[in-house]
């Protein structure tokens, strides 16, 4: 190829070439593994981690497409590693996957260029980017996917280097098996496979080695790689897991899960409208610049420009990698049906850019090697090699320096504490109707994997609407009575014979237990409103029979110190699950005064009760607003409105000037901080009126 960097020419000998690649890969693995192990969280991360760990712990099936390979490897790790929490063990496994991915990126670059420095640049810049680092130390499928991306690229390079037909056939078979195995983890890698397979077949055809028997062997190898999917129907048939997803005992059920039909086969989420293709692509380029730097992007482009004039055999590999990158980016931008203007959705989408960042990092490593090689050829300066090492070291060191503090998750237990607070707040033998990924995944993990609060029963609201949920899960919820086979607002018998029930009848059948919803209640079934009310219970709500009279003093006392939460407000980035958990816990402090205030606003409430409720709401709002300097901005608005209502009540015993001053101050603070509130103009108009009223009151006092 003409590149040699610091490792000598490929022609210098296969032995030293291979040993150099192996030693370098081991060194990269050890270095990255050490950093990842040092910084990984000791407890449960956010996102899908709780659900994936629970599925592995229970030997159930994870959300579509099932991730059987990850589930089996995580289950094995949970069993074999007897130290740390269950979450820590799986976090550690994922950190090791990330380290293997780094070593494979090094191997790929070194085999293509002979440059140790280029390989270290690719492995280090990718592994220690904020995005890769963050998702390599959490119990998620992304680090294993990165491993397979690195493996497929490394095998592609080895195939291109092979000089004998037998060796090419062997590598092709290993690659086919790896392709199948990679699809047992994350399906996005199929776009890379769709580029690599035709390229391999074309090379074999060009060498006149593509025979029917070889094609059959490759097909069998690919099929063998898919064997972990046998786990799905086996687990579903045994039905021993206290948590699982779907019924894969039938071919239809298996294909529904495999093709992610409940989400949309080629979509990230169900029933979501995403940003435009151009917006997603532009965001990807900007994100890549942030994660890897503009210099890395420039080196990746340089690799393509420069290698066009070099060894055509090797350059075809580079163009293949570039084609993979372009196809993946375009397809993903088309199918990413999430609005990335929302920080949390942006956090979901950006994880899938890891797959393209890995290719860019490899191209950048090659770009550095080609740049040094070309410069050395023109200037005949041996010191350029030292500059290559210095450049690689500086890039990697800068990545570590920039991202270490944010990626050091050793003391991050926010999701764990969030779930513990919710579970600890529940009375004995309660039923919790879960809604959403955050409470659902986190509470299930603590309940099933850590054995916390075995007395409570966790029932998923969304899952109860699926036909497979209750036939699979009801047996594992012995304290809960279900009036039918599936939750549906319209009761009856479906053509399949399934009996549907609504939430009202569910509550009636479980009157012996206290029932809570966390977080929120399914809007599609309002039948519970006939005889039940929702009372605030921290982040959750309690379903209470309407005949029970609300006692504000008693409820204030019960919910005042329901959680022990000490995290500062807005401590976490808006795209993180920690931010969502923190926001929920802070807003939980406001739910009781908001509920009491809403009751006071009701026209059916007698005047004396209305005054009592307004007073309670005012005092509670004042207490939480002045408890911390930084708090949710909507508290200012709610407290100001409460002050204004108190101002109109006779005989409150509070100086009207104080109430007016407080209302003005907090309305003003709200308008400063909430620039996008559609009611902002009305609030500003109300502020002018309140200021005139305050001035009039002060004038009267002076007289």
Swiss-Prot record:
Glycosylation sites: 403, 564
Subcellular localization: Endoplasmic reticulum membrane
GO terms of biological process kind: protein maturation
Stretches that traverse the bilayer: 20-40, 68-88, 90-110, 137-157, 182-202, 218-238, 314-334, 352-372
Enzyme Commission number(s): 2.4.1.109
InterPro entries on file: GT117_domain-containing, TMEM260-like
Top-rank lineage group of the source organism: Eukaryota
Catalytic reactions of this protein: a di-trans,poly-cis-dolichyl beta-D-mannosyl phosphate + L-seryl-[protein] = 3-O-(alpha-D-mannosyl)-L-seryl-[protein] + a di-trans,poly-cis-dolichyl phosphate + H(+); a di-trans,poly-cis-dolichyl beta-D-mannosyl phosphate + L-threonyl-[protein] = 3-O-(alpha-D-mannosyl)-L-threonyl-[protein] + a di-trans,poly-cis-dolichyl phosphate + H(+)
Membrane topology classification: Multi-pass membrane protein
Principal place of residence: endoplasmic reticulum
Disruption phenotype: Receptor maturation defects and abnormal epithelial morphogenesis.
Pfam assignment, any one: TMEM260-like
Gene Ontology terms, MF aspect: dolichyl-phosphate-mannose-protein mannosyltransferase activity
UniProt entry keywords in alphabetical sequence: Endoplasmic reticulum, Glycoprotein, Glycosyltransferase, Membrane, Transferase, Transmembrane, Transmembrane helix
Catalytic class of the enzyme: transferase
GO cellular component, one term: endoplasmic reticulum membrane
Function: O-mannosyl-transferase that transfers mannosyl residues to the hydroxyl group of serine or threonine residues of proteins. Specifically glycosylates the IPT/TIG domain of target proteins, such as MET and MST1R/RON. TMEM260-mediated O-mannosylated residues are composed of single mannose glycans that are not elongated or modified.
Entry similarity comment: Belongs to the glycosyltransferase 117 (GT117) family.
Protein name: Protein O-mannosyl-transferase TMEM260
Organism: Mus musculus (Mouse)
Name of the coding gene: Tmem260
């Amino acid at each position: 190829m003409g590149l040699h960097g610091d490792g000598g020419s490929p022609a210098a000998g296969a032995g030293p070439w291979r040993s150099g690649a192996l030693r370098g890969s081991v060194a990269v693995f050890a270095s990255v593994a050490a950093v990842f192990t040092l910084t990984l969280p000791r407890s449960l991360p956010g996102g899908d981690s709780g659900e994936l760990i629970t599925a592995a712990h229970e030997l159930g099936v994870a959300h579509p497409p099932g991730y059987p390979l990850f589930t089996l490897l995580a289950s094995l790790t949970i069993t074999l590693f007897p130290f740390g929490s269950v979450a820590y063990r799986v976090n550690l496994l994922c950190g090791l996957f990330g380290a293997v991915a780094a070593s494979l990126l090094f191997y790929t670059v070194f085999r293509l260029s002979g440059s140790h420095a280029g390989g270290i640049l690719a492995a280090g810049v990718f592994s220690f980017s904020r995005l890769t680092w963050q998702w390599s130390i959490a119990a998620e499928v992304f680090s294993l996917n990165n491993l397979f991306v690195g493996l497929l690229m490394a095998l592609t390079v080895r195939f291109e280097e092979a000089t004998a037909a037998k060796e090419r056939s062997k590598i092709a078979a290993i690659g086919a098996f790896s392709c199948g195995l990679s699809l047992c983890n994350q399906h996005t890698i199929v776009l890379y496979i769709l580029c690599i397979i035709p390229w391999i077949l074309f090379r074999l055809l060009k060498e006149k080695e593509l025979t029917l028997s070889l094609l059959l062997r490759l097909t069998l190898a690919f099929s063998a790689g898919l064997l972990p999917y046998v786990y799905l129907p086996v687990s579903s048939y045994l039905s021993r897991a206290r948590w699982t997803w779907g019924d894969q005992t039938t071919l239809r059920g298996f294909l529904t899960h495999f093709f992610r039909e409940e989400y949309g086969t080629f979509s990230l989420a169900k029933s979501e409208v995403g940003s435009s293709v151009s917006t997603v692509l532009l965001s990807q380029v900007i994100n890549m610049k942030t994660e890897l730097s503009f210099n890395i992007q420039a080196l990746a482009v340089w690799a393509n420009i420069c290698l066009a004039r070099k060894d055509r055999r090797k350059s075809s590999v580079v163009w293949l990698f570039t084609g993979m990158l372009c196809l993946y980016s375009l397809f993903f931008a088309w199918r990413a049906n999430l609005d990335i203007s929302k920080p949390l959705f942006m956090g979901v989408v950006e994880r899938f850019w890891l797959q393209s960042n890995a290719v860019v990092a490899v191209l950048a490593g090659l770009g550095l090697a080609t740049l040094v090689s070309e410069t050395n050829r023109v200037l005949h300066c041996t010191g350029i090699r030292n500059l290559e090492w210095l450049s690689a070291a500086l890039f990697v060191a800068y990545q570590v320096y920039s991202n270490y503090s944010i990626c050091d998750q050793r003391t991050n237990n926010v999701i764990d504490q969030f779930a513990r607070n919710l579970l600890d707040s529940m009375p004995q033998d309660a039923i919790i109707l879960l809604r959403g990924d955050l409470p659902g995944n986190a509470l299930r993990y603590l309940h099933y994997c850590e054995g916390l609060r075995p007395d409570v029963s966790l029932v998923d609201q969304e899952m109860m609407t699926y036909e497979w949920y209750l036939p699979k899960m009801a047996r594992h919820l012995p304290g809960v009575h279900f009036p039918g086979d599936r939750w549906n607002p319209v009761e009856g018998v479906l053509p399949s014979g399934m009996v549907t029930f609504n939430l009202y009848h569910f509550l009636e059948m479980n009157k012996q237990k206290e029932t809570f919803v966390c977080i929120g209640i399914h809007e599609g079934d309002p039948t519970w409103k006939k005889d039940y009310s929702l009372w605030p219970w921290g982040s959750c709500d309690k379903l209470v029979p309407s005949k029970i009279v609300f006692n504000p003093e008693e409820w204030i006392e019960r919910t005042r110190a329901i959680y022990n939460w000490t995290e500062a407000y807005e401590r976490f980035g808006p795209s993180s699950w920690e931010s969502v958990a923190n926001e929920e816990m802070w807003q939980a402090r406001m739910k009781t005064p908001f509920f009491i205030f809403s009751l006071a606003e009701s026209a059916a409430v007698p005047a004396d009760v209305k005054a009592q409720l307004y007073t309670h709401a005012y005092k509670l709002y004042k207490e939480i607003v002045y408890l911390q300097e930084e708090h949710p901005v909507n508290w200012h608005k709610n407290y100001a409105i409460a002050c204004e209502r108190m101002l109109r009540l006779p005989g409150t015993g509070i100086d009207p000037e104080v109430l007016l001053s407080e209302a003005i101050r907090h309305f003003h603070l709200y308008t400063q901080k909430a620039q996008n509130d559609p009611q902002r103009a009305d609030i500003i108009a109300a502020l002018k009126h309140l200021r005139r009223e305050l001035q009039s009151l002060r004038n009267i006092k002076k007289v």
